[in-house]
Amino acid sequence: MRWSRFFAYTQKEAPKDAVVASHKYLVRGGYIKQVAAGIYDFAPLGKMVLDNIRDIIKKEMDASGAQEVMLTFVTPNELWEETGRAKKYGKELLRIKDRKDQSFVLAPTNEESVVDLVRGTIKSYKQLPVNLYQINLKFRDEARPRFGLLRGREFIMKDAYSFHATEEDLDREFNLMEETYKNIFTKLGLDFRAVWADSGAIGGSGSKEFMVLADTGEDDIVVCSECDYAANIEVATRKHEKRENPVKTEVIEEVHTPDMKSIEDVCNFIGVDPYFSIKAVVKKAIYDDGKSEIVVFFVRGTDTLEETKATNAVGALELVDASEEELEAVGLVPGFIGPFGLPSSVRYIIDDDLRMAEELVCGANKKDYHIKGAGLLDANLLGNLTVYRDIAAVKEGDKCPKCGAPLKITKGIEVGHIFKLGTVYSEPMNATFLDENGKAKPFIMGCYGIGVSRLISAAIEQNHDDKGIIWPKQIAPFVVDIIVGDVKKDEQLIFAEDLYDKLTSAGVKTILDDRAERFGPKIADFELVGFPVCVIVGKKLKDGKVEVRDRRTGEKFEVEKDMALEKVMEIINN
């Protein structure tokens, strides 16, 4: 491809709303153009990267035995009504009506559609298992689309769905998909981790996320410093280590703590380590039937509440902050809430780490008073509704639940997610098969997604510098950029065209920059757009030399012109 004929454009300034590198460079480099909030056109460069990613994914999915399909983007709303997700998904599900006033949705995911495809078609266990996948457009009406392709409203996704007769066979496919995903992300040239995760709105009994490590990631990942333990902070656990309070209290007593509502103030006043205190976090739980209630979550004073864990612990759709007026309306005393003497109507959850804990400081449920020397040895002291759950967020330095080594927290961008769905979708949609005894059973399902367009941005977040993108060669739109210093010099153009022919004949994606531009802007475009290698055919050609540059390392090599091809191949294959 000649740059002079290629629909490519670069710009010096990034959009004002671009705050991450991938968004800035994709727009400046002419890969994408915004059409509306969270919706982008892909220019040729962007489409080439997208196709490279798609090809790697397709090759590995086909090798796993999965079969490609194409499901509808516009889906009847009635399918979503069958599973109850039409209501549960909320405003992110974009609903439309046709001229006959029939309701449809723009699919953000396709569980309902694929179950509808399979039910009545696969009738016997003899036809199982089957794994169907597609690489297709999706739409999620994000309230705040941002970060370019990382959180758009319209996006391209690879979603696969497997159907099984037994849980054991689902486990086999889940493990196969995990290995397939590892192969995909390795071949894409990415540094990633597979981590245990929350199933979220998709549902199911178990899931793993695939995270590209990047400082700009929105997700916190907990990883062990010694073993292979890794989990999203939403589900991460830790080894509980009990410490004995050196400050002993002969009797449980109330302490007057006027206007002291924070853990720090109370513990400093009483003279106790915050580890031996109980923090109350009050939320209003919203349920999918529209009802709500005030819930108190108790964690150690040194811990913070992990909201996804807390949401799952009470089976809520979401948790929102409760106002002081709402707390007072149910008999709570803001700033002085503790597990002893709570109003009987108030629901509460205690973190597992506090189970059987002693010598604690907590709120007395009375204004300006805290309790000193409290213990949770006897749950009956708290009433019959006491529930312990893991609701605290893991912190840096906590002990690994697997080996006991210190845990670290890093940032990641979610690019893949695999789920064990079980019968969450097949049962409500009455999708069944006949087992070996002739009995109707619901399909046991798995679900496996990859954010294809999101991978473009994730790759850049991991591979860039202050000049532009540094593409892994596996997904670069062009691997080599041949820059002609002066296109008016016939000898430069002839040599560049000959090298171009040799590289393309060798299967190397190459672009020939034959624009009648100054040398400076050509080099700037090479660095911005991010091709892995460039060959500069300039003034030194008359001395029999050209320059080869490695975009990743920044190294410059002056080589004999007859060695240019060999040097380029050496860098590419390194």
Swiss-Prot record:
One of its GO terms (molecular function) is ATP binding. Coiled coil: none annotated. One of its GO terms (cellular component) is cytosol. Its EC number is 6.1.1.15. The keyword Magnesium does not apply. It catalyses: tRNA(Pro) + L-proline + ATP = L-prolyl-tRNA(Pro) + AMP + diphosphate. The keyword Transmembrane helix does not apply. It is found in: Cytoplasm. Pfam families: HGTP_anticodon (PF03129), tRNA-synt_2b (PF00587), tRNA_edit (PF04073). GO terms for biological process: prolyl-tRNA aminoacylation. Its main location: cytoplasm. Consists of three domains: the N-terminal catalytic domain, the editing domain and the C-terminal anticodon-binding domain. InterPro entries: aa-tRNA-synt_IIb, aa-tRNA-synth_II, aa-tRNA-synth_II/BPL/LPL, Anticodon-bd, Anticodon-bd_dom_sf, Pro-tRNA-ligase_IIa, Pro-tRNA-synth_IIa_bac-type, Pro-tRNA-Synthase_IIa_type1. It comes from the Bacteria. Keywords: Aminoacyl-tRNA synthetase, ATP-binding, Cytoplasm, Ligase, Nucleotide-binding, Protein biosynthesis. This is Proline--tRNA ligase. It is an enzyme of class 6 (ligase). PROSITE patterns: AA_TRNA_LIGASE_II. Catalyzes the attachment of proline to tRNA(Pro) in a two-step reaction: proline is first activated by ATP to form Pro-AMP and then transferred to the acceptor end of tRNA(Pro). As ProRS can inadvertently accommodate and process non-cognate amino acids such as alanine and cysteine, to avoid such errors it has two additional distinct editing activities against alanine. One activity is designated as 'pretransfer' editing and involves the tRNA(Pro)-independent hydrolysis of activated Ala-AMP. Homodimer. Belongs to the class-II aminoacyl-tRNA synthetase family. ProS type 1 subfamily.
